[in-house]
Amino acid sequence: MKGLQQTVFKLLAVLILIGAMAGAWISWQRYHVEAAAQTVEMVYDYNNILDSAAIERTTTDALFELYRKNGVTSLAVYDENPEKLVNHNFIRVYRGYEFQARHPEISGILPDKIYIQPVDTADGSTYFKEMADHLSLLYSRDEVKAISENGVEALEVSGVYDKFMTMPLGIFTNTVKRAGSHGFYVVLRPANVAHAPKAFIDDFFHAVDASDKVSGVIFQGKEVFGYKEYQKEVSQGLNQRHIPIVMIEAQSQLGFEPQAGLLDMARHSDYHLVRLYAMSKDELIKLNQKEAAARFYISDIERNIRMNLFPSYKFALDGKTLSETNAAYIAGVRDRLENHGFSVGKASVMDAYFPEKPLRAVAMAGAVSLIVLTLLLLIPHLSRYGMVIEAVGLIGAEVLYWLLHVNILLQLLALGAAVCTPVVVVSLFLQYCLKKKDTAFSEVGWGRLFGESVMILWGCGILSLIGACFVSGLLSDIRFFLEMEYFRGVKATFVLPLVLISVVYIQKFPFFGKTVTSDKDFVSFVKKFCSIQIRLGLLLGLGILAIVGFVFIGRSGNNGAPVPQFEIALRRFLEDVMYARPREKEFLFGHPAVLVSLAALYRKWPQLLHYFLIVAVTIGQGSMVETFAHMRSPFILSFIRGLDGLAAGTLSMVGALLAVMILVRLTKFFGERYGKV
């Protein structure tokens, strides 16, 4: 029986290693895709600059130069509306009675109509003509009428004045030309107009073709431009011009802001897409310039964001004008990106990467073997059926993969790998502890304890990083990079390993004087555990565990518990000094627990304490693997984050060692005093 068990485990280990190599190769290909897309586009509102010039008593050219010097590469151009055209001195809009008072010589003016005239400039005439063209597409012939009488040129429009003034008229060709003439790229932000004619779509592309500086399209509102009738034509038209569709990251940082038709349009464009980070003005005003810059910078390097849309502060800061205030925090983003190896310019578009199907199939086989190995660790009696379970799992997974091509299978296997990797790694550590449990501390000493702990930590960490290759390899394709699809079960990757390692632990170490080796033993263990007397100290301990659980589970995922200011400061410090900021639960909690758990083993501390320390070790290893579940984060960043966590955890071990030494001295001191009483 034991020989069969060893044979099964060796076979599974070989399959796991082969699968991990396939996952690592896919991850290497993924790294090259991500490394080739290192340019971030910095976008600011074109109209904000025009509006600020008059208020700040400067010229628009001076403001354009200010923003260019401070990192802005592109100008966002929105749909025009009559109100904006009036404010920019291109047209005049009158109610009927106002127009009649100004032009009594013109007959047939109706008080309930709206009248539009150009401003007497070359730009006014150009914009007036383009406005007439747009209105003819959005209104029927009976609703728009041209007037030319006694040298007066005007348009008569039927409508409600207040609503008409804010009515979107579409992207104007002249605005695109003017924005592009200042040396910036132009990012268009069209809103959908329900049931607009095909000519309106054609007019949009006429505006797109007005400048070779158009670098992207960000749809405005809850629908993509052209929805529903012409969304495919819009997608194809943009693709033919090599203009990417920009997808706005959701506020939760998971997926995108919902826009009807967006995912279909993304597929029609062959995934010629860019991820964008935008912050609301209400959020911006809560932050100082340094923190605002940090938010954009972290989004770019950690979440494959390749376009930033910068909002404006509501008020100027530090004795600067509002434009100087905005330019300063944008410059902070640019400087940090360039120091990190990025460049600013036209947004990089990732290649539409999909791994070779056979290679992914090998990674799947390894993930299945990892799950089966974990099952056998949890229920050793199943080892006699290990070959059968493995065969059924492999055949079932591969048949589903090759026949159905469903993402849910990949997501389930990735979840299984993320859960099982820390369980297997910590189980190996437990096996090591079993061999060492009879070793006295006098044979070890503090120096050897530290060295042994460091070696075990790095050994476990490397194994966890190897296991993480399954998560990365299984989910590596453009849909997951852009988060059109994503890893499912983040909370489970935190909770399930703790439950499973507890099952493994009670089979290896005695609780209540006996290990659990059968169903009856487990039932007896549960009964004894439930009959533990609740004392004040235990309640206090449970309260501490509850707080830790809240921080550990509640802070995971994308909608976690709030982060205190002192921790934000620590994070920003680590971001400044390290390539990738490690997770606190790894280097401050899980990794130092390796040393303390060994100290507990050698000094024969209570078994319950040793168990909780093993749980802490599992948290650290699980967190390393879970990092790779965020497929929007570049592979190299997740990998280096794991290494940085191990390095920082090694330093934290020094503090843990000192704390244990002090604790031992204190208990010895008070124990001796108590013994003399």
Residue spans for each PLM region:
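Hydrophobic secretory-pathway targeting helix
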Residues: 1-52, 73
